[in-house]
């Protein structure tokens, strides 16, 4: 199914796409916040029954464009797994801010926009969590190896 939702893969899946062996349990994406894109996003994810991750069962949550427009970042559980929908990220900003710092990667047979290696390191450093610092060391090693093989 092609949805034409505008988003950028960041986080652990982006690190994996760049060669990190570290496993992740969720998909983090920065989505573009235009009304049209939010409507496409809601339509595309509706069949996956998105619900707020960690919320008590039965807590009212309406998966609709108004909910997404009123919020910014959503940690969701879907029928396919965990998904973090991010309107912006620390150290990187919005989808439009990040767009110049993307590369196209193949993920499960699909071409996806993914944060480039330099910017992935930058935003992980800005996030400042212990798990990000561990990932930064791996990503910097990957970057050094690429630079050696390019020269």
Model-based region annotation:
Residues 1-151:
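Compositionally biased terminal segments of proteins
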């Amino acid at each position: 199914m092609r949805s034409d939702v505008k988003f950028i893969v960041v986080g652990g899946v982006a690190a994996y796409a760049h060669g990190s062996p570290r496993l992740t349990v969720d998909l983090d994406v920065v989505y573009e916040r235009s009304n049209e894109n939010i409507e496409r996003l809601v339509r595309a994810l509706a069949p996956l029954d998105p619900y707020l991750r960690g919320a008590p069962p039965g807590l009212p949550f309406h998966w609709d464009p108004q909910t997404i427009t009123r919020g910014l970042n959503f940690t969701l559980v879907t029928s396919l797994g965990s998904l973090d929908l991010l309107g912006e990220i620390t150290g990187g900003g919005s989808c439009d801010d990040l767009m110049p710092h993307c590369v196209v990667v193949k993920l499960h047979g699909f071409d996806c926009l993914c944060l480039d290696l330099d910017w992935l390191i930058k935003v992980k450093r800005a996030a400042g969590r212990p798990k990000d610092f561990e990932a930064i060391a791996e990503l910097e090693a990957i970057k050094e190896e690429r630079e050696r093989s390019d020269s």
